Swiss-Prot record:
Short name of one Pfam family: Ribosomal_S14
Superkingdom of origin organism: Bacteria
Amino-acid positions noted as binding Zn(2+) in the UniProt annotation, renumbered to this chain: 24, 27, 40, 43
Free-text comment on the cofactor: Binds 1 zinc ion per subunit.
Cofactor(s) the protein needs: Zn(2+)
Physiological role: Binds 16S rRNA, required for the assembly of 30S particles and may also be responsible for determining the conformation of the 16S rRNA at the A site.
Biological process annotations from GO: translation
HAMAP family per UniProt: Ribosomal_uS14_2_B
Protein name: Small ribosomal subunit protein uS14B
Cellular component GO terms held in the UniProt record: small ribosomal subunit
Organism this protein belongs to: Levilactobacillus brevis (strain ATCC 367 / BCRC 12310 / CIP 105137 / JCM 1170 / LMG 11437 / NCIMB 947 / NCTC 947) (Lactobacillus brevis)
C-alpha cells in the first residue's frame, strides 16, 4: 500500500510532464499499471477473477 502522502501527491498536477506517473487507484502500486483501467496487474487479475470488470474473461486457447 502506498502512503497517504504519495497518493495525495499523485493527485496533484505535475509541474513538468516527465514527472507524472501512474499509480493503481485501488492499492497505490506505481509499477505495471494498465492505463485503460487505472489498476495494477495484481488488482486487475483479482477483479477479473471475481467478474467485476465487464467484458473481461479468462483466456483459453
Amino acid at each position: 500500500m502506498a502512503k497517504k502522502s504519495q497518493i495525495a501527491k499523485n493527485k496533484r498536477p505535475a509541474k513538468f510532464s516527465t514527472q507524472a506517473y501512474t499509480r493503481c487507484e485501488r492499492c497505490g502500486r506505481p509499477h505495471s499499471v494498465y492505463q485503460k483501467f487505472h489498476l495494477c496487474r495484481i488488482c486487475l487479475r483479482e477483479l477479473a477473477h471475481k467478474g467485476q470488470i465487464p467484458g473481461m474473461k479468462k483466456a483459453s486457447w
